[in-house]
Amino acid sequence: MASSLSSKAKTFKSPTKTPTKMYRKSYLSPSSTSLTPPQTPETLTPLRRSSRHVSRKINLGNDPIDLPGKESVEEINLIRKPRKRTNDIVVAEKSKKKKIDPEVSFSPVSPIRSETKKTKKKKRVYYNKVEFDETEFEIGDDVYVKRTEDANPDEEEEEDPEIEDCQICFKSHTNTIMIECDDCLGGFHLNCLKPPLKEVPEGDWICQFCEVKKSGQTLVVVPKPPEGKKLARTMKEKLLSSDLWAARIEKLWKEVDDGVYWIRARWYMIPEETVLGRQRHNLKRELYLTNDFADIEMECVLRHCFVKCPKEFSKASNDGDDVFLCEYEYDVHWGSFKRVAELADGDEDSDQEWNGRKEEEIDYSDEEIEFDDEESVRGVSKSKRGGANSRKGRFFGLEKVGMKRIPEHVRCHKQSELEKAKATLLLATRPKSLPCRSKEMEEITAFIKGSISDDQCLGRCMYIHGVPGTGKTISVLSVMKNLKAEVEAGSVSPYCFVEINGLKLASPENIYSVIYEGLSGHRVGWKKALQSLNERFAEGKKIGKENEKPCILLIDELDVLVTRNQSVLYNILDWPTKPNSKLVVLGIANTMDLPEKLLPRISSRMGIQRLCFGPYNHRQLQEIISTRLEGINAFEKTAIEFASRKVAAISGDARRALEICRRAAEVADYRLKKSNISAKSQLVIMADVEVAIQEMFQAPHIQVMKSVSKLSRIFLTAMVHELYKTGMAETSFDRVATTVSSICLTNGEAFPGWDILLKIGCDLGECRIVLCEPGEKHRLQKLQLNFPSDDVAFALKDNKDLPWLANYL
């Protein structure tokens, strides 16, 4: 990553598209002043809401403005000067047609179908360039956008000083060179510094006030401005403190009806607005390009800023105060990052064009566009109009690929109670609260706080185990979410949190790369990552610009990291024992006795602190389902109780209970639609739950398990028993055969022999009940159940020929 704006002399930035007339290492003092150096906020700023799609309400005043009879027209390279909006035009438009409130038109809530009206689509004329308020804007430009809707545009301009005040003398001189601090981004005159500087030094430069703070001294004497002097903040300071927005212009158009100019903005985010917050590797001027778009009026655009890639950013030492770095894109929906694909600037002038999809809502033929007097006088030809509306060479992301317009009747459809219940009971839906696990969550919270609150933070490990579907992972994530809020409030010391799921790793060794990326933000190979992590946790060396903060490492599916020599688990669990590691490890697995199955040197580090999540009983399952359905009247209480008791008797898996209730809601919805009965007055009854249970527990694969031979049932029971013992979904034929031999010997059954067992395993593989490797591997053949172990237990638990199978299920 490119280094920050180090030791640069700031240069005055004119509000044009590209910086011109710049002086090398000199600057006629541009923007930024305040008593304290500008700092980015320490707390996360809420993400932009849907109200951002509505532009600021412009105060046009009450005095009428006389319009000239005829306006002059200029046309240079398809650059058009928009006319000023006046009160007369707005009043005339209101008298002709009732305007829709922007807050209503952009509301994310689907209106009732009876309230919707079919309105004619607004006609638009698109441009590549527009001159607005004596400033030229073009597709692909980066601009500042007002964030406060009720802000006065005149005040905004007055608060944007063209020449920045010095942080020491609080004066602005047009003939004095200034230098910027790489830590606080404050500007200083060279002769105001102590000792004064004769020229701008090379490399990073930090002001004397930041040096005192970094040295650990609490008493820092910061100069105060003279009495009566008004301190004004620059656009850069407002953006980094979340008082302004930055955006990239994707489209430019004018509404033909009212003559208002609009832009399609693609938003930038500062690191504080992402889910991870500001990390140690983030630069002061770093922004993220998001996949969040909005349509706003040109009145909300203030002026240009300049967002550059790392290569250009490293050469922008003298390009002014409005230069920022963007190296990564940020997905606001998934909270993920990826590198920005750098597009060549010359693509727009190339002969090859992008064949973009025609958009129904914006493309119109020449006959449909009714040009006003200004356009008719200009006599724009069809070829020129097409050139102005095309987006030649502009392709910023794949946000519209594969999209299909949703019919109006679907948008206007109001969800019934059953439809709301089906959406709420989905496993992907995050619950508002987590019932029945308050005791476990309190224990996890106390463990983490005790590990990170002490100044002498020593590493600790906690092993969390329990059968699947008992809320282990979601409980830990809920605790971390609550601790994050306490960190923002200042009641808990800051920490670094890294979450890893073992099933998402290509190999156990890749966990080193994931941990290193979570700490440094860079992705390297696992060998180099292991070396750096050993230096970090064993020797106490920093990774990059890392702060001295504890690290909390959450590893889900910990048993996946078990290798032949168990070196991966040993390294991870050995790091917390080092004096300067400040590492807290939370391991989650399904097996209770996993530490006892590992090497003694690993179990001694892992098995000290344990927390067990037992299966849910029927009352807890009933409370979980009722909490999900709070405010939705779709189920009878007896139906919820019936589903809870049925699942609690088999496995106590909350996910299975939610799936049964969701399927019961689908059955009830189908039944009501088939009988033409209003769904508003009907609820899910016990019969619907019974149908869902029959579908789930009497599926074809369960019927096959019930009908297999006696030895096949013993073979499946041995696989389930082996799964419960080891916690590993995958096992070998050798282990299963040993378990079958032990089960047969204990219960007086004759052991069939290895060859017969191998044939039974292959037969179950042909039925797809078991996933297995080719039989030629014999004893080394790997086996795995193709269905949940609960289904096997349900199919074989009540077997009359072999009643003792229930003891192993």
Curated annotation (Swiss-Prot):
Its main location: nucleus. InterPro entries: AAA+_ATPase, AAA_lid_10, ATPase_AAA_core, BAH_dom, BAH_sf, Cdc6_C, ORC1/CDC6, P-loop_NTPase. One of its GO terms (molecular function) is chromatin binding. Follow a cell-cycle regulation with a peak at the G1/S-phase. Mostly expressed in siliques, flowers and flower buds, and, to a lower extent, in roots, leaves and stems. Transmembrane segments: none annotated. Signal peptide: none annotated. Residues 160-185, 201-205, 316-321 are annotated as: Histone H3 binding. It is found in: Nucleus. SMART domains: AAA (SM00382), BAH (SM00439), PHD (SM00249). Residues 223-341 form the BAH domain. Zn(2+) 1 binds at residues 181, 184, 207, 210. One of its GO terms (cellular component) is nucleus. SUPFAM superfamilies: FYVE/PHD zinc finger (SSF57903), P-loop containing nucleoside triphosphate hydrolases (SSF52540). A zinc finger (PHD-type) spans 163-213. Induction: Regulated by E2F. Accumulates rapidly after cell cycle reactivation by sucrose addition following cell cycle arrest mediated by sucrose deprivation. Zn(2+) 2 binds at residues 166, 169, 189, 192. Essential protein. Component of the origin recognition complex (ORC) that binds origins of replication. It has a role in both chromosomal replication and mating type transcriptional silencing. Binds to the ARS consensus sequence (ACS) of origins of replication. H3K4me3 effector that positively regulates the transcription of a subset of genes. Component of the origin recognition complex (ORC) composed of at least ORC1 (ORC1A or ORC1B), ORC2, ORC3, ORC4, ORC5 and ORC6. ORC is regulated in a cell-cycle and development dependent manner. It is sequentially assembled at the exit from anaphase of mitosis and disassembled as cells enter S phase. Interacts directly with ORC2, ORC3, ORC4 and ORC5. Binds mostly unmodified histone H3, and, with lower efficiency, H3K4me1 H3K4me2 and H3K4me3. This is Origin of replication complex subunit 1A.
